């Protein structure tokens, strides 16, 4: 009587323990015909089927609309070839690198091959994939019938924060992970979460890593210096953007040198537009953004200093590749900061009436808006969409300034300003990634100024935009 390698057919059907004798004791007791006809099952883990991957993704999703809090879970790793597919399609490299440059395609591919099992590097790669899919508003097919979205990968990262959320560690990949997750939630119009994640990265930059001190970079290789300088200024610009719209004072200042230009053969890797955007954000000092955040203008912000800001940003650089993603970012940031400098004068005590009584001053928003419209004339529509809420909000700032002055003109100049506002409004309302409340406020402001908006088409709103708590005021 031999011993079989698996349970007999009867015990497998009855789901009872089999002693694997021939015949087995269970079959003898029940007077059953003990057979071993079923094929031997292969031992070891099963291959992951498409349905299983889809089920994993569904289980790991969190209902963001209902704010369901899930208990801590141990999530399966995102398959290496899924991340590799995002890299091979060069989605980030071709479309987003010039806007938020961190690592090039070659560096990312090398990181995936060599450090997939490194916890910090792995979660950075997942979060970068999530931010890329979210910014481009696409999903990627992993296997037939199985697709992944940026929201799914972002949610997986947030569910797994215990694996990379170590505030005592200043690993650059951890900082970049928070930045990428911030990009995701900015696309989801979840401003509170987006801002909170950017604050996590800023805290690591200053308190742990010391990236705000130039001496921190002295002994680092050039490549590591460049990466850290890029990330530092990405966070500085993010923080200054939020200072305007959620009224938070800033922590970062231009205390270190920006990254250096790099010699590249591929224009999609050029840092020229990124360096110009840094210049736009840093020509006004830290006090400029803090004044906007607090509605309190100190002595360092004078009419002359604000005029200097407008003048320095009046011209564009000829070195930037025209009509590219980076070019659009630079142009709108330039018009936006010029408008903010104009508006800040209105907040200065005792200046408003005198300032608005000067025709040259009231004509500035019209000039800025006309410049912006000229820049949009030849720009393909798809170049705006990857920037998230930034482009429509900057354009809306310019439209708001027009409303402030449109009734300050005589009949002929008022007609000119109204025509410009007409075109700017049509452009602003044609953009995606808008939230209802922000545009409701703009409409209410126009109604209060007895201005009828020339908008005939419905708003193109992000399905995930939030109308109540998570709105930028």
From Swiss-Prot:
Q: Which GO terms describe its biological process?
A: maltose metabolic process; regulation of DNA-templated transcription
Q: Which InterPro entries match?
A: Carb_Metab_Trans_Reg (IPR050797), Maltose_ferment_reg_DNA-bd (IPR020448), Zn2-C6_fun-type_DNA-bd_sf (IPR036864), Zn2Cys6_DnaBD (IPR001138)
Per the record, GO CC terms?
Answer: nucleus
Family matches, as Pfam families? Zn_clus
Extract the GO molecular function terms from the UniProt entry. Answer: DNA-binding transcription factor activity; DNA-binding transcription factor activity, RNA polymerase II-specific; sequence-specific DNA binding; zinc ion binding
Where does the record place it?
Nucleus
List where the motif Nuclear localization signal lies. Answer: 41-49
Ranges of the DNA-binding region feature = 8-34
Enumerate the SUPFAM superfamilies for this protein: Zn2/Cys6 DNA-binding domain
Keyword annotations from UniProtKB, A to Z: Activator, DNA-binding, Maltose metabolism, Metal-binding, Nucleus, Transcription, Transcription regulation, Zinc
Q: Which PROSITE patterns match?
A: ZN2_CY6_FUNGAL_1, ZN2_CY6_FUNGAL_2
Report the Gene3D superfamilies cross-referenced here: Zn(2)-C6 fungal-type DNA-binding domain (4.10.240.10)
Q: Where is the signal peptide?
A: none
Similarity field: Belongs to the MAL13 family.
Role:
Regulates the coordinate transcription of structural MAL6S (maltase) and MAL6T (maltose permease) genes.
Name used for this protein in its record: Maltose fermentation regulatory protein MAL63
**Annotated organism of origin:** Saccharomyces cerevisiae
